[in-house]
């Protein structure tokens, strides 16, 4: 059975290395790493392909922004384009919630399901959720965040 404490530490380091600390990500990823992007129907095989995608991003990667991280203890982080907000999970499966800011000013919510094998990230399924305006018809039924 996996050691929850050490796996959580791996995932915390991994979340803080995303998306562009390529050396750290390489150390934290299993040799057979695969990442799926279900919304676009794409699969990334291997760290080298992941790195090439991010290094080729049109317009370059955005500048840093700070966010408060929620989880086992509160911390502040400053990372380029990506701010981890929360990590939950146990055993070999964890969820990372983050915010992404793109070079054109757009932003998205980011959720990654991370599966570990042999103490390294072997699989990641990533969802990108673009913010949208709430419909007026339910305005009196909800609170604005």
Which residues does each PLM region occupy?
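C-terminal and inter-domain tail/linker signature
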Residues: 1-145
């Amino acid at each position: 059975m996996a050691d929850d404490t050490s796996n959580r530490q791996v995932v915390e380091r991994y979340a803080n290395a995303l998306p562009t600390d390529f050396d750290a990500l390489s150390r934290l990823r299993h040799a057979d790493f695969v990442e799926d992007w279900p919304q676009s129907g794409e699969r990334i095989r291997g760290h080298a392909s992941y790195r090439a995608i991010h290094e080729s991003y049109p317009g370059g990667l955005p500048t840093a922004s700070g966010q408060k991280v929620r989880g086992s203890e509160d911390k502040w982080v400053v990372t380029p384009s990506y701010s981890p907000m929360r990590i939950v999970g146990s055993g070999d499966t964890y969820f990372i919630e983050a915010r992404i800011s793109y070079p054109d000013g757009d932003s998205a919510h980011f959720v990654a399901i991370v599966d570990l094998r042999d103490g390294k990230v072997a699989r990641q399924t990533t969802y990108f959720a673009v913010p949208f305006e709430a419909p007026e018809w339910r305005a009196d039924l909800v609170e604005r965040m």
